[in-house]
């Protein structure tokens, strides 16, 4: 699997079933650029979770809905409900643990 880019219109449908990880980011964000490849790699290794990315500048309504003030902001959703979030860059092993504990 890979990280699929979604927008505000896709969001509710994307996260409604199962476990989803959403990487809220922006093109100008340095730590976001570092985190992207980590999540891409994990998307191939943690196959029972869906991975998405959303640009907060292009989708400010969703960023506002979740009170996102800092990025990267990675949220785990289970059946459409946010169960946890992480703000800032964390290394691969820590991100894997964060995702696994919230599945």
Positions of the model-derived regions?
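N-terminal "domain-start" segment that seeds a small globular fold
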Residues: 1-13, 50
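Conserved helix-turn-beta segment immediately C-terminal to the redox Cys motif
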Residues: 19, 36-54
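Structural microenvironment flanking redox-active thiols in thiol-disulfide oxidoreductases
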Residues: 56-63
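Conserved redox-active cysteine motifs that mediate thiol-disulfide chemistry
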Residues: 24-38
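Non-catalytic, surface beta->alpha helical segment in thiol-disulfide oxidoreductase systems
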Residues: 78-103
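Structural micro-motif
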Residues: 66-75
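Short active-site neighborhood of thiol/selenol oxidoreductases, capturing the structured segment around
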Residues: 15-25
